[in-house]
């Protein structure tokens, strides 16, 4: 006779399909997002609930993520990987502004499924009572812009005056588009994409 594994708090019945240990990190992220959508708030997610949903010990979550903020960082890393992912064969034939647009749209499209939760993550990182998050966020933003330049294959050499100007401009662009995207309710993020195209048009 086969015995079902005991459920914890009735949550395990709704766990995402399980895989091997190698994909537990990804399942932790996915389950955290799912719980945030159910609760209506990222800050309401508790890692012990994530462990219950995945039917793993809470200590196993700690093996992969030090806290919920680290889970958020892993979610944003998916956007970064999409940004630097495969490009069309003719990518280098495009103007620089178009390459930048393709890369940024890839980032936003990847995170769009959980846009509201993503916005909550970002607001949490900016919370005035959490100054220990500020410096890492600044460095993460800088890293994102560096990878944007890499992904768009901008030719200016790192450390040159031109590269520095590009970084300042791309940082301002990214933040302005991000603020709009966080509250964009349009289908396919069309409002965000139109705004991005308008902002990039002067570069043509």
Question: Predicted segment positions?
Answer:
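Amphipathic alpha-helical packing segments from all-alpha helical-bundle domains
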Residues: 130-156, 164-176, 194
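N-terminal positioning helix adjacent to the helix-turn-helix/winged-helix DNA-binding module
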Residues: 20, 24-31
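Helix-turn-helix
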Residues: 2, 27, 35-74
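Amphipathic alpha-helical interaction segments
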Residues: 49, 102, 106, 120, ...
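Short, basic, alpha-helical segments at the C-terminal edge of helix-turn-helix-like DNA-binding modules
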Residues: 76-84
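Hydrophobic alpha-helical connector segments
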Residues: 74, 88-120, 127, 138-140
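C-terminal peripheral helix-coil segments that are non-catalytic and often amphipathic
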Residues: 1-11, 150, 179, 183-204
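Short, hydrophobic secondary-structure boundary micro-motifs
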Residues: 44, 119-123, 160
């Amino acid at each position: 006779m086969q015995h079902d594994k005991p459920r914890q708090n009735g949550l395990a019945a709704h766990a995402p399909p399980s895989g091997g240990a190698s994909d537990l990190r990804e399942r932790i992220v996915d389950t955290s997002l799912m719980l945030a959508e159910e609760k209506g708030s990222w800050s309401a997610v508790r890692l012990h609930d994530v462990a219950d949903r995945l039917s793993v010990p809470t200590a196993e979550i700690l093996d992969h993520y030090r806290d919920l903020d680290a889970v958020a960082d892993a979610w944003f890393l998916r956007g970064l990987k999409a940004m630097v992912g495969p490009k069309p064969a003719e990518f280098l034939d495009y103007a620089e502004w178009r390459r930048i647009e393709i890369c940024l749209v890839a980032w936003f499209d990847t995170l769009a499924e959980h846009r509201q939760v993503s916005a909550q993550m970002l607001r949490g990182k900016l919370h005035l009572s959490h100054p220990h998050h500020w410096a890492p966020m600044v460095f993460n933003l800088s890293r994102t812009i560096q990878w944007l330049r890499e992904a768009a294959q901008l030719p200016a050499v790192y450390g040159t005056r031109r590269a520095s100007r590009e970084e300042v401009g791309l940082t301002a662009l990214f933040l302005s588009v991000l603020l709009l995207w966080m509250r964009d309710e349009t289908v396919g993020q069309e409002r965000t994409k139109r705004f991005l195209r308008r902002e990039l048009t002067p570069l043509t």
